[in-house]
């Protein structure tokens, strides 16, 4: 089973348990704290992924590191993934959990790249248009790329909406080359 599929299954199980058990907000906050620790500690991630370190040792490590950070229910989940030899997937499980939570709440992550900085009003207008286009709440991530020459590109999941000047010039070039042939 691929790690993404397995991660999604564990994330889905935790999300379902958290919703049914009434500790969704708590689990979400605790997973966010775990993610911060994992992002800051490469060594911990390597230990969790190491095939040399046994499941009992990983369980003990997770308990030591996160005892003050997480509650009993999330700790049970951490122990479970360690026992099932899936602790190395913890960073991906957290990512998948957030994706599933966003999906359930009608939130979509969108990457907006522009050639020049956009004003707050421009960003708000674009986000409003994207929200009406997708029918979901938009969580935007802004980036700058001078190679676009002008305009913006928007990435929504696997879909890219390219309104950049660079793209328009590439299309024009293709049209001119195909006319010449």
Swiss-Prot record:
Superkingdom, taxonomy of origin: Bacteria
GO MF terms, alphabetically ordered: proton-transporting ATP synthase activity, rotational mechanism
Record membrane topology: Peripheral membrane protein
Gene3D superfamilies xrefs: N-terminal domain of the delta subunit of the F1F0-ATP synthase
Keyword Transport: yes
Keywords of this entry: ATP synthesis, Cell inner membrane, Cell membrane, CF(1), Hydrogen ion transport, Ion transport, Membrane, Transport
Main location: membrane
GO terms for cellular component: plasma membrane; proton-transporting ATP synthase complex
Record family assignment: Belongs to the ATPase delta chain family.
PANTHER family linked to this entry: ATP SYNTHASE DELTA CHAIN (PTHR11910)
Known role: F(1)F(0) ATP synthase produces ATP from ADP in the presence of a proton or sodium gradient. F-type ATPases consist of two structural domains, F(1) containing the extramembraneous catalytic core and F(0) containing the membrane proton channel, linked together by a central stalk and a peripheral stalk. During catalysis, ATP synthesis in the catalytic domain of F(1) is coupled via a rotary mechanism of the central stalk subunits to proton translocation. This protein is part of the stalk that links CF(0) to CF(1). It either transmits conformational changes from CF(0) to CF(1) or is implicated in proton conduction.
Name recorded for this polypeptide: ATP synthase subunit delta
Organism: Chlorobium phaeobacteroides (strain DSM 266 / SMG 266 / 2430)
Phylogenetic lineage: Bacteria, Pseudomonadati, Chlorobiota, Chlorobiia, Chlorobiales
């Amino acid at each position: 089973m691929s790690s993404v599929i397995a991660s999604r299954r564990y994330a889905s199980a935790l999300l379902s348990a958290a919703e049914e058990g009434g500790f969704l907000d708590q689990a979400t906050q605790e997973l966010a704290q775990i993610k911060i620790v994992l992002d800051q500690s490469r060594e911990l991630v390597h230990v969790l992924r190491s095939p040399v370190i046994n499941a009992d040792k990983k369980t003990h490590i997770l308990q030591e590191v996160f005892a003050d950070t997480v509650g009993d229910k999330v700790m049970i989940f951490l122990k479970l993934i360690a026992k099932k030899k899936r602790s190395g997937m913890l960073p991906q499980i957290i990512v998948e959990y957030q994706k599933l939570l966003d999906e359930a709440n009608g939130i979509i992550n969108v990457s907006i790249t522009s050639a020049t900085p956009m004003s707050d009003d421009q960003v708000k207008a674009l986000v409003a248009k994207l929200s009406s286009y997708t029918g979901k709440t938009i969580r935007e991530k802004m980036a700058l790329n001078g190679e676009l020459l002008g305009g913006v590109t928007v990435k929504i999941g696997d879909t890219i909406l390219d309104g950049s000047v660079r793209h328009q010039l590439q299309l024009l070039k293709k049209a001119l080359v195909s006319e010449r042939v």
